[in-house]
Amino acid sequence: WQAGDIAEVQPGNSTARIQAFMQKHHIAAQSIVESLAISIEQALWDKNLNTEIEPFANLEHLLEQLSPLPTREYSIASVPTQQVLRLVVRQQQDSEGELGLGSGWLTQHAELQQPIALRIRTNESFHLINDNRPIICIGNGTGIAGLMSLLHARTRLDYTQNWLIFGERQREHDFFYQSTIEAWQTTGMLQRLDLAFSRDQAEKVYVHHKLREQATELKTWVENGAVIYVCGSINGMASDVDAALIEILGEEKLDQLR
């Protein structure tokens, strides 16, 4: 993969969920699906078990009624030269305490050392420029993942004109990759760092506030050829950041950068 690419993860069902489904439908443990030569537990791991089931004559007929669980996409936080694929996953829960499909699988249901089924999706629109122009990385929450991959790639090329603008809730708990980011500052690999921790003061501060605070510097970087990368929540941050960039740079200039 390249910096900026996406991991499409295939979530699975927890052992408890599979066992409950089998008990409900009176399926004996370790029953073999003859056509697949695997156990029914293995066959059910990636199936949508919320499906309404019609009476089935055999396990093959049962499986024909079950669609696969949908995949979940995560920005990759590392580059191949690190020899590890890193994701940043926030565990999600609904109002009834049910864990999110992807986050529940990755943070709780999958066993340690268990292989994770995923494929890489090329994300060309977020790939790194192939020269040493400055870059401005803007993001919030788990969006730090995609930005970290870009910054890791830049540091390996000794490109130092990098600016990170990042927002989260609390510095104490939510400053992801703090030691790495601070080390980059110390070594000069990260020329600028602006942080917006919304819950650390009475008046909430977000990424778009930091952009407006640094409007003059932002315009200078863009005039010097900087490329802007934005990674984070579509609901909220993206529209606020877009509005701030239009206000600072003008709509025509921003369109040229897209």
What are these regions (language model features)?
Residues 1-258:
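FNR-like FAD-binding dehydrogenase module
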